[in-house]
A protein has these predicted regions:
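Short Fe-S-cluster ligation motifs
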Residues: 65-93, 121-143, 156-173
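Residue-level signal for pocket-adjacent positions within structured domains
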Residues: 8, 24, 31, 51, ...
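Cofactor-binding beta-sheet edge motifs in enzyme active sites
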Residues: 1-15, 30, 127, 135-137, ...
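Iron-sulfur (Fe-S) cluster-binding segments and ferredoxin-like electron-carrier domains
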Residues: 43-74, 99-123, 135-151
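Immediate flanking context of iron-sulfur cluster ligation sites
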Residues: 21-42, 49, 73-96, 111-130
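Short, structural beta-strand-to-alpha-helix junction motif
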Residues: 17-22, 59
Length: 194
């Protein structure tokens, strides 16, 4: 039996299992994606006592006494900074890897509010993206850090799409859902959705 905290709520788990399976199957928290189940892809990245950790390699027994945070448990200003930043730079394509990238980036920014490009690359080294390359993701994390430092403001006109047109940048209509891990993929659909 193990007791720990998930997004501030105390939970007790009777059976030893992978933390990712507990999050997804028992708590129906789908922002931690199951891309490999063996710690290779980073789509399940969460925070454990503030550090970016892959949920598929941590067991519930090893989580005992720890503070676990998923995308849902990030502070609202952090969530909004990443939604804006990833949307503004076009860092989201299919979106499957993005919640893990957000968690890796958020852990880095909490540790160093002004990360360099090299630090960002190092922070996401264990996170695989098959769509965007990494350039826009790195730019997105850098912009999120600038927003959180107060150096850049969220451009609500850009986010709302008030000024779309030929030759102008546009947010994907699903960027918020994909950044926050709310986008549904086949493995995210369970009996609660039926």
């Amino acid at each position: 039996m193990a007791t720990f905290y998930i997004n501030g709520a105390e939970v007790t788990v009777a059976k030893k299992q992978k933390l990712l399976r507990y999050l997804r199957d028992d708590l129906h928290i789908h922002s931690a994606k199951d891309g490999c189940s063996e710690g290779a892809c980073g789509t399940c990245t969460i925070h454990v006592d503030g550090a970016a950790v892959k949920a598929c390699v941590l067991t519930t027994a090893l989580a005992a006494g720890r503070n676990i945070v998923t995308v849902e448990g990030l502070p609202e200003d952090v969530r909004e900074a990443f939604v804006y930043a990833f949307g503004a730079v076009g860092a989201v394509q299919c979106g499957f890897c993005i919640p893990g990238m957000v968690m890796a980036g958020a852990a880095l920014i909490a540790e160093d509010p002004e990360p360099t490009e090299e630090q960002i690359k190092y922070a996401i080294r264990g996170n695989v993206c098959r769509c965007t390359g990494y350039k826009k993701i790195i730019e997105g994390i850098s912009l999120a850090a600038a927003v959180l430092r107060g150096e850049k403001q969220i451009d609500e006109d850009l986010e709302r799409g008030d000024d779309y047109g030929v030759g102008k940048r546009a947010f994907r209509i699903d960027v918020r859902k994909k950044v926050l891990g709310e986008g549904k993929y086949p493995d995210d659909i369970d009996e609660l959705d039926q």
